[in-house]
């Protein structure tokens, strides 16, 4: 069995500050709002809070465009508020980790302002600048065909010095040049040591596989012939110096007992293990996207093909097994700030099955091996935004840019309206904004998130789905999560560290698996992921004792729609 560590046993609750809780009536969530709910967070059974970017920022990409690592976005609060949050978490036995956004900064960061000021500036080489390509007519073009994750070219021309800078994300997010040692040292001091010295317990490391770019900056292979700019992951992910950089960064954190989890994304098992093998001393663990990107093209989230339950099992198997038999560690998550809501994506958000399928997903997730991550609102079953919302309600730069590019490309086609409807269907299913609507605290106006109209529209179903109503209801999804997290905490060897065995893998309606650990009874979990009754046939021998289920009636012979059962078998 894997060596026990606090960060392996952590249950992490992710907070997206803008949409969590507004304390001062400006319509935007803030740090004092978070502090006011720490008792609620502790009551869930979580052990760690992950706070998404709260640094000073122009907010072009919701704080992933940092203008000052050593300060706080004014609408969220102050450095003093952060000190209070750190102390408030620690007083309740909670750890606090921050988002570490160091692949890029904002164009408003003082480093970039200096870098762009002249070709001779000492910080010029802290970012990635290249001269234009000039065609036979003397026209300027980007240095290569690399595409941005947020549509269009990954290069932006800067008139002042006549060169392009690289931005793998938005134009306002220039990539830092990790090849420059002075730049790296500044990152470590400003973004890492500053916060660890304040008492923060670690980091979720954003875009952790992107720091080392191949220095030839060649054109990327053409993956989408209908698009001028191409996905360029092969030249900026898992690059030649990436592990050198991570080892160097880990040395900076070594004096502190930190938890680090990397967002690396699409990697082979061999590539992934290099980041999180204990022997390599880089990161504790990483997020793999097998589950949350099911049915989508990882290079283009809105090219969607759908999936079935067997596909989901394959993704969970792949994600769970990658660390088995190694000294690495895995993570378990099904929602975050970049993904759609799990009930809408993997369950059934109709009024009839919403709560049942939410409990089914909860049981599945809370029984998986690895460090468990839960996203704000997931514990009450918040859903995707209604399909009836117009595109104007979406705030995310990723969606806005994609929709704009789509309209420019197809807007004059005779069948544009049909194409647009199909795109909006997919946007509604997968857009990041689904996770970014305000947390639904009560059935009061604005869902108890704020006393004024929030920065983003509250989901229309807040009167049916909210913390206040579920808190005192023993049969609610919220209290089902509490029961599951209590079980997970009491039986760590089984649920956190145990071995998962899939049973009847090809069944397209039932998800059945066992969890085993030395010295523990076998846990047998069976979940009906369909909207119809399915016959129940025990797949392992022994005496079955029902521990937890999401339905009131006791039917041993069949599972009703979205019924989930946990047995102990001896």
Curated annotation (Swiss-Prot):
Keywords (A to Z) from UniProt: Glycosidase, Hydrolase, Maltose metabolism
Keyword Transcription: no
Name this protein carries in UniProt: Alpha-glucosidase
GO biological process, one term: maltose catabolic process
GO MF annotation, one: oligo-1,6-glucosidase activity
Residues the UniProt record annotates as site (Transition state stabilizer): 338
Reactions catalysed: Hydrolysis of terminal, non-reducing (1->4)-linked alpha-D-glucose residues with release of alpha-D-glucose
Entry's induction text: By maltose and sucrose. Repressed by glucose.
UniProt xrefs under SMART domains: Aamy
Keyword presence, Hydrolase: yes
Active site: 206 (nucleophile), 263 (proton donor)
Top-rank lineage group of the source organism: Eukaryota
UniProt EC number: 3.2.1.20
Species, as recorded: Candida albicans
């Amino acid at each position: 069995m894997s060596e026990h560590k606090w960060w392996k046993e952590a249950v992490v609750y992710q907070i997206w500050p803008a949409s969590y809780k507004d304390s001062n009536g400006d319509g935007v969530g803030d740090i004092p709002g978070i502090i006011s709910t720490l008792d609620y967070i502790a009551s869930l059974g979580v052990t760690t809070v992950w706070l998404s970017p709260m640094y000073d920022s122009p907010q072009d990409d919701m704080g992933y465009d940092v203008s000052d690592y050593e300060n706080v976005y004014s609408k969220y609060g102050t450095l003093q508020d952060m000190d209070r949050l750190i102390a408030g978490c620690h007083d309740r036995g909670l750890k606090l980790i921050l988002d570490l956004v160091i692949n890029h900064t904002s164009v408003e960061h003082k480093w970039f302002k200096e870098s762009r000021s002249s070709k001779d500036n000492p910080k010029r080489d802290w970012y990635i600048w290249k001269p234009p390509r000039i065609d036979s007519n003397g026209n300027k073009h980007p240095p290569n065909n690399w595409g941005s994750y947020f549509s269009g070219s990954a290069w932006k021309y800067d008139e002042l010095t006549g060169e392009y800078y690289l931005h793998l994300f938005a134009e306002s997010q220039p990539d830092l040049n990790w090849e420059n040692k002075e730049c790296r040292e500044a990152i470590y001091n400003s973004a890492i040591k500053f916060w660890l010295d304040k008492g923060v317990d670690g980091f979720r490391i954003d875009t952790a596989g992107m720091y080392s770019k191949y220095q030839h900056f060649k054109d990327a292979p053409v993956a989408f012939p209908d698009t001028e700019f191409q996905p360029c992951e092969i030249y900026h992910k898992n690059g030649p110096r990436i592990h050198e950089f991570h080892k160097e960064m880990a040395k900076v954190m070594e004096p502190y007992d930190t938890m680090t989890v990397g967002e690396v994304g699409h990697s082979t098992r061999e590539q992934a293990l290099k980041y999180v093998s204990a022997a390599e001393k880089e990161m504790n663990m990483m997020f793999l996207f097998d589950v949350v990107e099911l049915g989508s093209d990882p290079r283009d989230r809105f090219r969607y093909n759908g999936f079935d339950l067997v596909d989901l099992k394959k993704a969970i198997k792949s994600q769970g097994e990658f660390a088995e038999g190694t000294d690495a560690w895995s993570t378990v998550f099904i929602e975050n700030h970049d993904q759609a809501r799990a009930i809408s994506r993997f369950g059934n958000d109709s009024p009839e099955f919403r709560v049942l399928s939410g409990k089914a997903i909860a049981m599945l997730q809370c029984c998986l091996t690895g460090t468990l991550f839960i996203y704000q609102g997931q514990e009450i079953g918040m859903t995707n935004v209604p399909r009836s919302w117009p595109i104007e309600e979406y705030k995310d730069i990723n969606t806005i840019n994609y929709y704009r590019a789509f309209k420019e490309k197809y807007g004059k086609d005779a069948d544009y309206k049909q194409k647009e409807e199909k795109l909006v269907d997919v946007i509604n299913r997968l857009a990041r904004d689904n996770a970014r609507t305000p947390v639904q605290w009560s059935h009061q106006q604005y869902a108890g998130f704020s006393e004024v109209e929030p920065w983003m529209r509250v989901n229309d179903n807040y009167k049916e789905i909210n913390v206040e109503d579920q808190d005192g209801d023993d049969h609610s999804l919220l209290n089902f999560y509490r029961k599951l997290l209590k079980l997970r905490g009491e039986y760590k060897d089984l649920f956190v560290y145990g071995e998962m065995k899939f049973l009847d893998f090809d069944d397209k309606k039932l998800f059945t698996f066992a969890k085993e650990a030395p010295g523990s009874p076998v846990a047998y979990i069976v979940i009906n992921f369909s909207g119809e009754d399915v016959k129940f046939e025990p797949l392992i021998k022994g005496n079955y004792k029902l521990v937890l289920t999401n339905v009131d009636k006791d039917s041993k012979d069949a599972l009703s729609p979205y019924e989930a059962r946990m047995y102990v078998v001896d």
